[in-house]
């Protein structure tokens, strides 16, 4: 079974975590921006049901 030979340094751990957190933050900002545009009615590229009667 493969086992790492040495510990990962604290700085490397922090760098990797910072990269992951930055990607997650960017995705959250983009999702929030898209949700805002849909809710305010400014979006022109999303298609969604305008009324609640979808059964027809």
Swiss-Prot record:
Question: Which BP terms in the Gene Ontology apply to this protein?
Answer: translation
Kindly list the GO CC terms recorded for this protein. chloroplast; large ribosomal subunit
The gene is rpl32
Keyword annotations for this protein, in alphabetical order, are:
Chloroplast, Plastid, Ribonucleoprotein, Ribosomal protein
GO molecular-function annotation terms? Answer: structural constituent of ribosome
This one is known as Large ribosomal subunit protein bL32c
Would you say which domain of life the source belongs to? Answer: Eukaryota
- InterPro entries named among the record's database cross-references: Ribosomal_bL32 (IPR002677), Ribosomal_bL32_plant/cyanobact (IPR044958), Ribosomal_zn-bd (IPR011332)
